[in-house]
Amino acid sequence: MKQFKYITAVLAIAFCSASWAQQETIITQFTEQMNIINPAYAGADNKTVIASSIRSQWTGIAEAPEMQLVNFSTGLGKNVGMGISMVREKTFIEKQNFVTIDFSYKLKVSEHTDLYFGIKAGGNFYDVNVNGLETYNILSDPALVNINQFSPNIGTGVYLKRKKWFMSLSVPRMLNTERTRNDNGIATVATDRPHFYAATGYDFTLNSKGNLFLQPAILMRYVNGAPVSVDINTMLSFNNTFKIGGTYRTDQAYAALMNVELSKRFVLGFAFEKSTRPELARARNTNEILLKFNF
């Protein structure tokens, strides 16, 4: 019965959100996978990168939200970059698979400053299977119906980069799309609204040897109909091989973060997140694992 109360509460939150606007992917370690939110970042690392994240919310609760993410980024010449992203999200009976391809172009602003322009194109495969809902012999709501739709989308962004700092502006999904279903006069609507992202970060050198850095970064999300969300991220970096720090997400969560460069090609990251929202006070922790390969 206790587990059923958890499931009922989370389902209510999820379906209330779906009735108005679908929230895009939240990544705590956003500085490690910027091209998910900004196509202009594709190729900006000046190397080929394959990164994967697994995010499990409210661990210990069956069928709680999960996210798997894989992205690839590389340069296609002196000024052109390309990336591919695949994001899979599952929340109880709801599944989303968003696949995109990114292209970027680099403009040399000065000797130490690069400006990248990016475009993103792809779509979202959205599925709701109400047959998988366990009702515990309680009559299900007739407004809950199966949905299986594909929604194409496009995005754009700019990324300004110097050795010690960056600025990012992007709208990864520009189209305002609706997923509708009508069964026996009952209409179900879920809306994807454009999200605006703005981010910046700076590397402060803390010692004369130049191997100890403080790396603050800020990410702002805005979507019409929802409060502005801001991630404030601060990492302490030792020789750029070991990083430890934390994140605060306004009115939502705080997290502890750690990144370890196991070799010149392989990075392992971990985030342990706790919600600050009263309605989720009894929910479990959220874990996020990052694997990153550089070539």
Residue ranges, per PLM feature:
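Subset of outer-membrane beta-barrel
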Residues: 22-295
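Bacterial N-terminal signal peptides
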Residues: 8-16
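Bacterial N-terminal signal peptides that target proteins for export
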Residues: 1-8
